[in-house]
Every structure is written in C-alpha cells, then in structure tokens.
Amino acid sequence: MARVCQVTGKGPMVGNNVSHANNKTKRRFMPNLQYRRIWVESENRWVRLRITAAGLRLIDKNGIDAVLVDLRARGEV
C-alpha cells in the first residue's frame, strides 16, 4: 500500500540530507501517517482511515461527514 494520506493526498517527498560540510545525499520525507478508526454518527459505524496528522485536523475542522463526501467522490472509501 502506498504511503499516501486518504484525506489530504499527501505522500512522500524527496529532498537532501545536508551535512555540516554541506555534502548532500538524497532522502525521502515521509508523511506522518496513522491508521485511525473514526466514529461516523450519521452512519452509526466506524470508518478506518490511513490519515496524516494534518488529515486529522481537517476532520476536526470540517467534520467527518464532509470529509467522507469528498472521499467517496474520489473513490477512496
């Protein structure tokens, strides 16, 4: 499974490790992903999502129902 947030769509980014001597080596910045079970009151059931911390804050802000409408429109859930 890809390391992508189901809510925000954020995935890994590519960048550099930079040493004190300014040597650069490639690295990946991984999103802060967690599996979360979120209670959906309108459907009276749990929904399991793989989301980032930013996705959790988005659910707190907009509500799980609005986020689920967007996910279903994209075919994620």
From Swiss-Prot:
Keywords, sorted A to Z: Ribonucleoprotein, Ribosomal protein
Listed GO MF terms: structural constituent of ribosome
SUPFAM superfamilies: L28p-like
Pfam families: Ribosomal_L28
BP GO annotations: translation
Cross-referenced InterPro entries: Ribosomal_bL28, Ribosomal_bL28/bL31-like_sf, Ribosomal_bL28_bact-type, Ribosomal_bL28_sf
CC per GO annotation: cytosolic large ribosomal subunit
Family of the protein in this entry: Belongs to the bacterial ribosomal protein bL28 family.
Listed NCBIfam families: L28
PANTHER family, A to Z: 39S RIBOSOMAL PROTEIN L28, MITOCHONDRIAL, LARGE RIBOSOMAL SUBUNIT PROTEIN BL28M
Full protein name: Large ribosomal subunit protein bL28
Gene this chain is encoded by: rpmB
